[in-house]
C-alpha cells in the first residue's frame, strides 16, 4: 500500500525487517537501508536505471536480499511543496512496485536531499567528480534517516 502519512506507515512497518529507501532519479537511483534495529540509515548502492521492468525487479531483489520489509521513496516536490513531472514518475513507479510485489511504500518529501548530499560530500573533502558517483546514495541515507527519526518519535 502507498502511504503519504508517517503515522499510518509507522503502524504497518514490520519491526523485524529492515527498511529500504530510494532516491529516485531519471538515470540513477540511490539506495539505502536501515540497520536491523531500524535506527540508523546505511548507504547501499547507486543503481543505474535500465527500463521500468528491470528496475522493479532489480530493486525488489535488493529489498529481498537485505531482508527489508518496506520501502521509503523520496518524493521530489518543488520548493513550494508542489508536485511535478518527476513526482508523477515516482508515484507511478511506486504504484507499479506495490501492484507487482505487494509491499508498503512511504513517499517522503525529499526537497533539498541531493543538495544536502552534495554538501556532506564537500564537507568530507570528496572531490566533485567522486561526489557525483555517490550523491544519490547519500541522499537516500539522508531521506531514510529523517524517516527513521520520525518513526522513533512516534513510537515514544
Curated annotation (Swiss-Prot):
Q: Gene3D superfamilies under this entry?
A: YqgF/RNase H-like domain
Question: What's the top EC group for this one?
Answer: hydrolase
Give the GO biological process terms: rRNA 5'-end processing
Molecular function as annotated in GO: nuclease activity
The protein in question is named: Putative pre-16S rRNA nuclease
Keyword 4Fe-4S included in the entry's annotation: no
Q: Which GO terms describe its cellular component?
A: cytosol
- What EC number(s) would the UniProt record show? 3.1.-.-
Provide the family line: Belongs to the YqgF nuclease family.
Please give the InterPro entries that the UniProt record associates with this protein.
RNaseH-like_sf, YqgF, YqgF/RNaseH-like_dom, YqgF/RNaseH-like_dom_sf
Query: What is its subcellular localisation?
Result: Cytoplasm
Q: Which domain of life is it from?
A: Bacteria
Q: Which UniProt keywords apply?
A: Cytoplasm, Hydrolase, Nuclease, Ribosome biogenesis
CDD domains, A to Z: YqgF
HAMAP family per the UniProt record, alphabetical:
Nuclease_YqgF (MF_00651)
Its job? Could be a nuclease involved in processing of the 5'-end of pre-16S rRNA.
Amino acid at each position: 500500500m502507498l502511504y503519504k502519512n508517517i503515522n499510518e506507515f509507522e503502524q504497518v512497518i514490520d519491526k523485524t525487517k529492515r527498511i529500504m529507501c530510494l532516491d529516485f532519479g531519471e538515470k540513477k537511483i540511490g539506495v539505502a537501508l536501515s540497520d536491523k534495529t531500524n535506527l540508523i540509515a546505511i548507504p547501499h548502492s547507486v543503481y543505474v536505471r535500465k527500463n521500468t521492468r528491470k528496475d522493479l525487479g532489480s530493486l525488489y531483489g535488493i529489498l529481498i536480499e537485505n531482508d527489508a520489509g518496506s520501502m521509503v521513496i523520496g518524493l521530489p516536490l518543488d520548493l513550494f511543496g508542489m508536485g511535478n513531472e518527476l513526482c508523477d514518475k515516482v508515484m507511478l513507479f511506486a504504484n507499479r512496485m506495490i501492484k507487482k510485489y505487494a509491499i508498503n511504500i512511504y513517499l517522503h518529501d525529499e526537497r533539498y536531499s541531493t543538495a544536502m548530499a552534495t554538501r556532506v560530500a564537500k564537507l568530507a573533502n570528496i572531490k566533485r567528480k567522486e561526489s557525483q558517483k555517490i550523491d544519490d546514495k547519500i541522499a537516500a541515507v539522508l531521506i531514510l534517516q529523517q524517516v527513521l527519526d520520525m518513526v522513533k518519535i512516534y513510537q515514544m
